[in-house]
Amino acid sequence: MLVIFSAGVSEAGRGVTTDAGWARQDIEDFILRNYSPTVSSQRMAASILSTVKTLDMDAMHDDTTVVVARLRERCPVNVMIGPPESKDDDLSTMRLFFGKDGKHVVCGGTTANAVASYLGVKVHTLPGSGTEEVPPMSEIHGVDLTTEGVVTVNVTMKRIKDYLADGMYTLELAHMKDGASKLALVLLEEATEVNVLFGNASNLAQQDTEFSFERKLQLVQELRDMLTLAGKTVKMSIC
């Protein structure tokens, strides 16, 4: 990881909370304490800027720039949202999905059950993982992240929009424990490329709700566009 910063960082707090600003050695120690092989460039930059704001008592007395670059390995993330239109395609779809390298994320209760059946395991709901806004997550052995479907994806979109609008939002997002936040972090800070497999099956219970099939497809297309804007290579397939 390479960290470059302007004098606004080293001068942070001068005459306010410190006598001579934020000492270079202290900055280096801060970076080392907050570094891990998985911490994103945006998270590191936001952490440094947050400390500058604290030292300046939120006044930001000097122009401050932080640039962080990180060399990392490729990390594909494969996301299945909804089961295929025909149950006859379940087996081939699962083989396609799990045949891809990288992490595997499953969104939706029906999808989770189909995946668990294919893997020969059970779906376990994670107690306490839900909020008023986001349904609880589940756990499937062999799957990296399992969330509820369209409601979670809808909130994930909001999280991604907030992330792209405000570079400091990563610090808030990192402390959220719901499925939408975890999904947003995986897509934004872990994935180098995203493969979305969108199931064409209709959910009759949602036909007359705000989450009709057409709306779900539109939502997933918006997710693709937002991730592309975030610099991800995104491929979307409909099954």
Language model region names:
Residues 2-51, 204-207:
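Active-site-proximal, acidic helix/loop segment immediately C-terminal to a metal-coordinating Asp/Glu
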Residues 49, 53, 184-185:
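Generic structural signal for well-ordered alpha-helical scaffold segments
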Residues 54-59:
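Short proline/glycine-enriched turn/loop segments at secondary-structure junctions
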Residues 60-61, 190:
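A short, structural micro-pattern
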Residues 62-66:
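Short hydrophobic/aromatic beta-strand or adjacent loop that forms the aromatic wall/cage
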Residues 67-72:
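Short hydrophobic alpha-helical segments used for membrane anchoring or interfacial signaling
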Residues 73-103, 112, 116-239:
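Non-transmembrane, aqueous-exposed alpha-helical and coiled segments at domain scale
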